[in-house]
UniProtKB/Swiss-Prot annotation:
Belongs to the class-II aminoacyl-tRNA synthetase family. InterPro entries: Aa-tRNA-synt_II (IPR004364), aa-tRNA-synth_II (IPR006195), aa-tRNA-synth_II/BPL/LPL (IPR045864), Lys-tRNA-ligase_II (IPR002313), Lys-tRNA-ligase_II_bac/euk (IPR034762), Lys-tRNA-ligase_II_N (IPR044136), Lys-tRNA-synth_II_C (IPR018149), NA-bd_OB-fold (IPR012340). It comes from the Bacteria. This is Lysine--tRNA ligase. It catalyses: tRNA(Lys) + L-lysine + ATP = L-lysyl-tRNA(Lys) + AMP + diphosphate. Its main location: cytoplasm. Mg(2+) 2 binds at residue 405. GO terms for molecular function: ATP binding; lysine-tRNA ligase activity; magnesium ion binding; tRNA binding. It is found in: Cytoplasm. Homodimer. Keywords: Aminoacyl-tRNA synthetase, ATP-binding, Cytoplasm, Ligase, Magnesium, Metal-binding, Nucleotide-binding, Protein biosynthesis. Mg(2+) 1 binds at residues 398, 405.
């Protein structure tokens, strides 16, 4: 069906060209968006025509009803949909015959005319001129119908956005969230900076990196897993408030909340600590939620989340002890192992830090409302400053919402000797087979030796945040072009064929 449709369209385009009609013109003078037209003319009475105002807009035809000498159709642009009405006695016989013969659902057109409100109260353009701007070679996809594999819509997101307004709107929200974050931080004096994506030594998180080869130097390099260590170098160099919003890469699995290529923001402030970062996190999240929804309460997966300040604070030690009966600071590794085995959890590397993380994984989903999880043990926090009152734990928090980590923050470790020793422990873990343990970064230690002021740092996962704000169940729904298993072009054509209409 797709092949026949495409061949027919190619013939039609050749026919248009023979008539000296360009099916792909270079530009169109669009003076109004659909949203502008609706707002400007919402005060019209049903049946009233605004004869003294001429509008020009363009978009894709999403529906079309032809009635002999007239037709109604809806045009979709980035801002919404607007109804258009074409009549033979208004545009003339030649233009109307062209419309009847060559304009179809899916075509991109430009229209010019006056605006009126229909008898049913819908703002409508009375067309005086219409111009074909693009004649697609493929039929319009129906909304999900017949598509056997949802991954088709991930592979061909442009099809998803054409067919489903919800998808387009979801990405509008995503990029509005990113804008709001930048606006908020810029207003507070933070400076957006850039750090390398290709690194000689990668660090700043516990993750397996992507490895590549730099031909010009004939050396192995890594794609960054986090921006932390270079952003701290900015603080050493004299910057006091910095952030970077961009892509990180971790060569790990896919899940509803994990994606190997993901977007995050990291924020660093000199002369601040993790308490300051908690306040900043609350303020930022409330700012975003109120800007988008006009309230601090939203629904996610049928659960009401309340972002009103202040948020709950819990200590990792206390929460695990309450729910599992094990003390992660006092109990032996054997006791922790027993509890994990009771819950059917396998521990590949029998290290205290790994066991603590596995224990937390068992109880994380019990935290639903915005909550700060505090005071992670030193073993799982190699870049965080030790707590000023208990050196067994760190001045660190994670923001947990709906059982998911949304943010991670520290009072940043700025003691170069302590940092070097913690790197050594990470190296020992790597040598024992832990591919996610951090590498030794001697240049970063050298930077700390020049002196870094007390600093608070914060990292936020943009994709997970957008999941919450768009009520999306999986991370791939909020990444425009996510990773999917490869299929041949021919296999993809078969998958999409059932979801097309002529």
């Amino acid at each position: 069906m797709l092949r026949e449709f495409r061949e027919q369209r190619i013939k039609e385009i050749e026919q248009l060209k023979r008539k000296n009609i360009n099916p792909y013109p270079n530009r169109f003078d669009k003076t109004h968006t659909s949203e502008m037209i609706k707002k400007e003319f919402e005060g019209l009475n049903p049946g009233e025509v605004k004869d003294d105002v001429f509008v020009s807009t363009a978009g894709r035809i999403m529906s079309l009803r032809k009635h002999g000498k007239s037709a109604f159709f809806h045009i979709k642009d980035f801002y919404g949909r607007i109804q258009a009405y074409i009549r033979k006695d208004v545009v003339g016989e030649e233009a109307y015959e062209f419309f009847k013969e060559h304009i179809a659902i899916g075509d991109i057109v430009g229209v010019k005319g006056n605006v009126f409100k229909s008898k049913t109260g819908e703002i409508t353009i009375l067309i005086k001129e219409i111009k074909l701007l693009n004649k697609p070679l493929r039929p319009m996809p129906e909304k999900w119908h017949g598509i056997k594999d949802k991954e088709v819509l991930y592979r061909q997101r442009y099809v998803d956005m054409i067919a489903n307004d919800d998808t387009l709107n979801r990405f509008k929200v995503r990029f509005e969230v990113i804008k709001l974050i930048r606006d908020f931080l810029n207003s507070k004096g933070f400076i957006e900076v850039e750090t390398p994506i290709l690194e000689y030594v990668t660090g700043g998180a516990s993750a397996r990196p992507f490895v590549t080869h730099l031909n010009v130097f004939d050396i192995e390099m890594y794609m960054r897993i986090a921006t932390e260590l270079y952003l701290k170098r900015f603080i050493v160099g004299g910057f006091e408030k910095v952030y970077e919003l961009g892509k990180n890469f971790r060569n790990e699995g896919l899940s509803y909340k994990h994606h190997p290529e993901f977007t995050s923001i990291e924020i660093y402030q000199a002369y601040a600590d993790y308490e300051d970062m908690m306040n900043l996190t609350e303020e930022l999240f409330v700012y975003i939620v109120e800007k988008l929804f006009g309230t601090t309460k939203i629904k996610y997966q049928n659960v009401e989340l309340d972002f009103s300040r202040p948020w709950r604070r819990i200590k990792m030690r206390d929460f695990i002890k309450e729910h599992l009966g094990v003390d992660i600071l006092e109990d032996s590794m054997g006791r922790m192992m027993d509890v994990l085995e009771e819950h059917g959890v396998e521990v590949e590397i029998r290290d205290k830090g790994h066991m603590i993380e596995k224990l937390w994984d068992l109880v994380e989903d019990k935290v639903v409302q915005p909550t700060f999880l505090l005071e992670h043990p030193v073993e799982i926090s190699p870049l965080a400053k030790k707590h000023r009152e208990d050196p067994r734990v760190t001045e660190r928090f994670e923001l947990i919402i709906y059982g998911r980590e949304m943010a991670n923050a520290f009072s940043e470790l700025n003691d170069p000797v302590d940092q070097y020793e913690r790197f050594l422990k990470q190296v020992e873990l790597r040598e024992a087979g832990d591919e996610e343990a951090q590498m030794m970064d001697r240049d970063f230690v050298r930077a700390l030796e020049y002196g870094m002021p007390p600093t608070g740092g914060l990292g936020i996962g943009i994709d997970r945040l957008v999941m919450l704000l768009t009520n999306s169940a999986t991370i791939r729904d909020v990444i425009a072009f996510p990773l999917v298993r490869l299929k041949s072009f021919e296999e993809e054509e078969l998958d999409i064929e059932g979801g097309s209409q002529e």
